[in-house]
Design a protein with these regions (language model features):
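Conserved beta-loop-alpha segment that forms the PLP phosphate-binding cup at the N-terminus of a helix
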Residues: 73, 92-120
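Hydrophobic residues in well-ordered beta-strands that form the structural core
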Residues: 122, 143, 206-208
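Active-site phosphate-binding strand-loop segment of PLP-dependent enzymes
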Residues: 151-221
Length: 224
């Protein structure tokens, strides 16, 4: 027996308008970052997955809570070694938190830093989901223009000075310095040091998104 209830009367008053019914990908698809399906080594993946299941199957079939809320420790140890080797940082497995994708990571960061009405600095063109997540919790993203080397640091300083003159201090600066989304630019190392100087001068932390940082084919990966 179905209940005759008008559920829309229980919805939040500030919900966004319903999206259009799904009709398939557009002709030029920029939805999601993924490899060309023809290049995926399916046979090698099957072999690797089979080996892991034989070795860790019982652990993988359960929640694995024995490793604590930060996630599966062997994976955290692997990630910490990779970060130390490739990004120039020095971290341990205890500094790593496993999340269900970048969306959950962004939500946790926003929950830790932001209140409704706060301001966050972002690149003028940036990861759409990051912007939407800020707006959804009542945070105002302030965009700074880009060039072929990433965020314009001169304009970033101008924007910060203008906001501070109005007694507005952004909670953090969200940037994608390596293979920027959607521009694809890579911030030079000298600019990275300048960005750190800006962060120190204005006492505003940086949230660095390195989703595509491994996709560099013709040069070494710059430091985080």
């Amino acid at each position: 027996m179905a209940l005759d209830i008008e559920y829309s009367t229980f919805f939040k008053s500030d919900l966004p308008a319903p999206s259009q019914r799904w009709s398939g990908f557009p002709e030029y698809n920029f939805i999601g970052g993924h490899n060309d399906a023809e290049t995926i080594p399916v046979d090698d993946m099957i072999k690797s997955i089979s080996e892991v299941l034989k070795r860790e199957g019982k652990t993988l079939a359960t929640y694995g809570l024995q490793h604590g809320p930060q996630g599966y420790k062997p994976l955290r140890e692997f990630i910490s070694k990779k970060v130390n080797k490739r990004s120039g940082l020095s971290v341990s497995s205890d500094d790593i938190l496993i999340t269900s994708g970048s969306g959950q990571a962004l939500d946790l960061i926003n929950a830790a830093f932001c209140n409704p009405g706060d301001t966050v600095i972002v690149e003028q063109f940036s990861y759409g989901s990051a912007i939407n997540r800020l707006r959804r919790i009542g945070v105002k993203p302030i965009g700074v223009p880009l060039n072929d080397e990433g965020i314009r640091l001169d304009l970033l300083v101008e924007r910060l000075e203008d906001l501070l003159d109005k007694s507005i201090k952004p909670k953090f600066i969200y940037v994608i310095p390596t293979v920027q989304n959607p521009a694809g630019s890579i911030m030079p190392e000298k600019n990275r040091f300048k960005l750190l100087e800006v962060s120190k001068k204005f006492q505003i932390p940086i949230v660095e998104d390195e989703c595509y940082a491994d996709l560099i084919w013709d040069s070494s990966r710059p430091p985080a």
